[in-house]
């Protein structure tokens, strides 16, 4: 029999001294107590039965008490179980190993791992031999509390003492390691199992494959999949779903469908999740015909589409502006007795809002109420954002009032939309008021919020205030992103602070944020307009040498600078160069060149470019 003497010192060395088990310190964990009528009724009956059993003389066997405690745990009444255990002990009933395992489980669910190990010490003190359930529960508790290294240490010590954990134990530890992103530790643990009495199973492999796919290491996931096949471990539908999802995330639909065909050949039936993953991937690529065809295939296989299947398709149609088809699909799901949920309505309301069809969007909001579907904070945010983008701030305030009336607290997204909307309609005072009132309402502005403010202030030529907010971000340990930097660079350039803009661009790089083509185009434009054409030409050449994929806007900025200087030879060379790189001139390119040529009385050349512009379909005659 293995010795557990080390665990007594393990407990003391790993955790602080344990106070006596008490529920007083746990009452704040009210989230663990469900409040539905059904749960309340079950809870009341279970407690009453437990108390009746305690009054019996002699009391019934302990396993009867264990059954009641287990049923309460299933309904997440962890505090009740702890309280009943105290009564249990005070009435002189001796707990068995199962009782103490239940208690450990409760403390682990409440994130009180120290109390869980106190119970474990109690098990050892009573001379009970901890079983795989005891140890697995403690491993799970340590992982749940983020104590991954301690979970591994606990595992190593237990195994070193000769105690055999089971597949559930290892599955639990692997799952905890994966959730913590400890993929190297997982790989080491898997190798340790080779030659071990506990063999890796499909659950363990699938858990690791899921972790790798989540981290976009699909190649490594495929290698592990091949390894399990070689070892004679048959993949199941969950394994395939995980890999299919991984390939879809990477945009490799060909491999994803290849796995679907492999499933069919191996007589592993795809489930609704398999089809949903693939339909979602097709929808995101705009392949609606193939997505609809796949849904028909699942119906033929007697796999019923669920609300998520329909939401995927409705979302894809909405993003393509096919609102008629999206609405028809919602009607179809209702005919199939699949009730639309809040996400279905949010998808449709969002699509209508983006098309400016606010009347139809509000009609859907009313329909939600008729169907007893409560709008979420996201529903109201979608409406406020859409109204803000149309400059309808009075209506946006009405929606905000509706939101408050529904007892839904506005979040940072709500305030961001309001601030953005107020800047759009030039109501800077209102935008600033909303921003400064956020903290009083218990909402902390995020990076996007500061970016909206900085961008809005810069556009209103209030650059000093924008810089002040930028500095405030740093004092609050908030890291500006590329959009924040670019907004401020643009503001500085447009307000004739080019040197400060260049300095900020350098600082941006020092912070590990690489400026993009849009950021550089702003600086290039400022150099050209600031009469520093030679610097602009050098800078433009530097971008080409560095391999930046310049867009038509960047070329247009440089062409405009050259045209203003009358350097038409350079303009023609640059036009040829951009076409050679696959960047086609647009209407702005031609208009810039034509206007400059006419200004310099180069009428013949201007007319030649005008004919070319018409021939390319860039000007309607």
Where do the model's predicted regions map?
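Methionine-biased hydrophobic packing positions in alpha-helices, especially
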Residues: 53, 88, 123, 158, ...
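Helix-turn-helix repeat elements of alpha-solenoid scaffolds
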Residues: 31-46, 77-78
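Pentatricopeptide repeat
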Residues: 46, 61-66, 81, 96-101, ...
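N-terminal mitochondrial targeting presequence
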Residues: 1-35
